[in-house]
Amino acid sequence: MILKTTGGSPHFNIALEEALLEESAEHGIAIARLWVNPDSIIVGYTSDVGREVNIEQARAEGVPVVRRISGGGAVFHDLGNMNVSVYIPRRLGVDEAYALVTSIILKTLHRLGIEGRVENGNDVAVGPWKVSGSAAAIRARATLAHATLLLTTDPSRIRRLVIPQLHRVERGEVTPVKYNPNSLERITGERMEVWQAARLLEESVKHALGEPENVGRDILQEAVIRARELCKTKYSQKGFWSPLGLGACREPQVAPMTSPSYVL
């Protein structure tokens, strides 16, 4: 099943990641999700928010911080960034999870005539710029691998809000690409809307996972109910994230990708 989700608060959208992972495990089905998030900083499960996020700037701009269930560092989401998530009903290795989701991004870039490459295992670069980062959450019965794709996001906002961990470059742990983000619009000089990216990503997901299974609406309803509870009890709680608040659990519209509208 390939889903699209429209709107919703960052807290609910991240809660839905955990809920869909649980649905994948329980029902033994592969699910993919294409989605956008309003302005937010999404940090890894073990991220040190104080070291990775410019909290004062985030407060000044009204940007909430939300912690996801996967590892990795802090990333900035806005409506110019497309997210793709895949939920696989088995335990994958970290490298296998990264290879799966980066292949979807690379295939999408190839369809656009853009040459991309993987760096640092979980980044996709075009020239000297990072256009996509990915992370994974691995459980006993299912794996979540998700990635960003910077379409029109202003990279100066990322640099204002997310603190690059340059000591990792100095130690030789990662290449400088990891902390050199840029959007496809600025690299190519051509604007791509999210609905256009959704169409291309949908084809890339099918190439990676095969034709999606036809799953009933009851699984979607179960996922939304799970996410509703997770958002209320976990993801909107200030102590779980940061002192930033803005924890309203505003729900997105959730629909199969087969519906006629691609407007996200």
Curated annotation (Swiss-Prot):
Major place of residence: cytoplasm
Protein encoded by which gene: lplA
Organism encoding this protein: Aeropyrum pernix (strain ATCC 700893 / DSM 11879 / JCM 9820 / NBRC 100138 / K1)
Record's subcellular location: Cytoplasm
Assigned EC number: 6.3.1.20
Annotated pathway: Protein modification; protein lipoylation via exogenous pathway; protein N(6)-(lipoyl)lysine from lipoate: step 1/2; Protein modification; protein lipoylation via exogenous pathway; protein N(6)-(lipoyl)lysine from lipoate: step 2/2
UniProt catalytic activity: L-lysyl-[lipoyl-carrier protein] + (R)-lipoate + ATP = N(6)-[(R)-lipoyl]-L-lysyl-[lipoyl-carrier protein] + AMP + diphosphate + H(+)
Record key words, sorted: ATP-binding, Cytoplasm, Ligase, Nucleotide-binding
Domain BPL/LPL catalytic: 26-213
Binding annotation for (R)-lipoate: K130
Subunit record text: Monomer.
GO molecular function, one term: lipoyltransferase activity
Summary of the function given for this chain in its UniProt record: Catalyzes both the ATP-dependent activation of exogenously supplied lipoate to lipoyl-AMP and the transfer of the activated lipoyl onto the lipoyl domains of lipoate-dependent enzymes.
Gene Ontology cellular-component terms listed: cytoplasm
Sequence positions that bind ATP: R68, G73, A74, V75, F76, K130
Protein origin, superkingdom: Archaea
Protein name, entry field: Putative lipoate-protein ligase A
